[in-house]
Amino acid sequence: MRTRSACLTVCLTMTGLLLFGSAFAARDSHLEPYGTAKKNMHPYPRINRVYDVNYNKPQELNALYNFITNVNKVVPGKTVVVLHGAEIRAFAQENYLKYQAIVDKMASLAKRGVEFRMCNNAMHAAGFRARDMDGFITVIPAGFAEIIYLESKGYRYINPVPTPVKDSRCLDNPKASVCKHRS
């Protein structure tokens, strides 16, 4: 009798788990009509790249720092940043204290081999001269011409739009577990 009762309990428990589990699977299946993503964590060949930077605000250089850092982790090759927007004021020595955090980040990239080239035309239009700029900056004749030149030498063009993705999941799903501590 005990054996039969134990068997019945086990059978009911297993049936319940199967039904309960399949209810969850059925409930979530409408959220996965295309299945789930595959991973392809392949290595990249050596690729030289040129970043076309024309930002409205120096603070947007933080996104550039993240772009370059992340790409350089997985893609070998040379990195050149061509600056020709309002962000150039961050590199003026007179503004160092105001933009110290971001300039120090850019200088750390320069120490790791990233080249920073600044458009002479943009620099003059902003009211600066080469002697006003930080020492890791190289002033070049024209930003767009430099980009064209580097592309002709095999560099790949990157336009790093400073749109952050951090916490973007929380915009559509504020109840997601990763969002709870960010409220």
Where do the model's predicted regions map?
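Secreted/extracellular ectodomain signature
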Residues: 25-183
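Bacterial N-terminal signal peptides
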Residues: 9-19
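Bacterial N-terminal signal peptides that target proteins for export
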Residues: 1-10
